[in-house]
Each structure stands twice: as structure tokens, then as C-alpha cells.
């Protein structure tokens, strides 16, 4: 159940539940790139899985990866569950509650309704082309940099995100498991957190509440 602000790691916890119950005024999103990181708690995996299950992307996981690259790369947020639907931050089967006081009740109600028919979800798997989709992501970054939409360290962060969403070091089409995506997320997160530029961004956010461009 979410209410108010559910972004970054908080959203990663919520979105990997079987269902979410969200208050109408909830704000959701994966905003890690703004502080020099990539989602490292399953956010990349979960959002990619949601997109590849869309009928339009069943046969082309690369296109789903591009969609997710843009959503996470821009740090897109949705200020209501309705606005979150097209980004797949909230799903059609999730429950939206208008009255905040009903949030916990509706959550228990949903749990009880799932008891009799619950089935373990299918394990995510992804088929990504490797170098081909990674090069597409790199071209997006080059284009944004040439238009002065992103600068300096933004590109480095984008390259790490591209590495996660293209399947890492694989240059050929590769089938990836849920655990593979978790591992790639963690590797990129650890590399980025060691950079003083990431730490500068985190410090600025904590001390001023604002992002810096470095």
C-alpha cells in the first residue's frame, strides 16, 4: 500500500508486490538518476518485465528496454495513479483508493480476495540483443547531449543504465533471468556510488533538496 511519496527505493519495494493499493494522491517513480545512481533494488528489472509483457513488445524486448531506458533515464514521475498507468508504474490490476483512511482496509481486502486463487507469478525472463540495443541507447544519449538536454555526468549515468537494460557485456542476443538483471543493477550501482560526482549529487540533494548538474 502506498500513499504520498513513493519514489526510488520505496517504489522498488512496492512495485515488486503481486498487487499495489495506492491512494489517489500518490506520487511514484524511479528517480535515482537524479542523484547519480541507477535503481539497484529491482526497479530496472520490474519495470522492464512490465513492459515486455505488453502485447506490443512480446516479440521485441529491445523496444521495451528502450521505453524503460527513457522512463528511468529521465527520472519520470507520476503525480497520481492515473498518470502512472501509461508508464506502467501502476498497473490496471492495482487498486486505487480515494479515501486515505480506507487504504489499510482495502489492502487487507485485496489480500483476502487473492487467497483462494493465488498462483505464484511466472519468473521474468528477457531476450535482449546486447550490443545492438545498447548502441541505440548510446545514440539517444549522444542526441540529448548534443541538444544540451543532458550534460557531463548525466551521460556516464546513462551509460550505466544502458549496460543494465541491454544485458551487460553480452554482445549477442542473450536470454536473461530475473537474477541476471538484479546482478547487473547491483554492479552498476556499486560502480556509481564509488564516484565522487555521485556523492556530490547525493550531498546536494540531502543538504539543499535540489539536484545539481556536474
Language-model features: where?
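Glycine-rich beta-to-alpha active-site loop
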Residues: 1-35
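Glycine-rich phosphate-binding loop at the start of an alpha helix
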Residues: 8, 41, 78
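Active-site capping/gating regions of soluble enzymes
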Residues: 13-19, 28, 68, 81, ...
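Metal-dependent DNA phosphodiester-chemistry modules and their immediately adjacent helices/loops
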Residues: 25, 37, 47, 132-135
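Acyl-CoA/ACP chain-elongation machinery
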Residues: 34-42
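Intrinsically disordered, low-complexity segments enriched in small/flexible residues
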Residues: 49-80, 86, 92, 97-214
Amino acid at each position: 500500500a502506498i500513499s504520498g511519496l513513493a519514489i526510488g527505493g520505496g517504489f522498488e519495494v512496492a512495485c515488486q508486490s503481486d498487487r499495489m493499493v495506492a491512494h489517489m494522491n500518490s506520487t511514484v517513480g524511479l528517480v535515482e538518476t537524479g542523484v547519480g545512481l541507477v535503481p539497484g533494488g529491482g526497479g530496472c528489472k520490474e519495470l522492464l518485465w512490465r513492459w515486455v509483457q505488453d502485447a506490443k513488445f512480446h516479440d521485441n524486448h529491445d523496444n521495451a528496454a528502450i521505453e524503460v531506458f527513457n522512463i528511468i533515464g529521465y527520472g519520470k514521475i507520476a503525480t497520481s495513479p492515473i498518470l502512472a498507468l501509461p508508464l506502467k508504474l501502476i498497473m490496471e490490476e492495482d487498486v486505487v483508493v480515494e479515501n486515505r483512511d480506507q487504504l489499510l482496509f482495502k489492502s487487507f481486502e485485496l489480500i483476502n480476495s487473492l487467497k483462494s486463487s493465488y498462483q505464484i507469478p511466472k519468473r521474468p525472463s528477457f531476450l535482449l540483443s546486447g550490443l545492438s540495443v545498447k548502441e541505440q541507447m548510446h545514440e539517444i544519449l549522444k542526441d540529448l547531449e548534443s541538444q544540451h538536454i543532458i550534460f557531463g555526468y548525466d551521460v556516464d549515468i546513462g551509460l550505466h543504465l544502458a549496460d543494465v537494460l541491454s544485458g551487460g557485456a553480452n554482445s549477442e542476443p542473450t536470454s536473461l533471468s530475473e537474477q541476471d538483471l538484479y546482478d547487473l543493477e547491483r554492479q552498476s550501482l556499486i560502480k556509481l556510488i564509488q564516484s565522487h560526482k555521485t556523492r556530490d549529487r547525493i550531498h546536494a540533494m540531502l543538504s539543499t533538496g535540489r539536484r545539481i548538474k556536474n
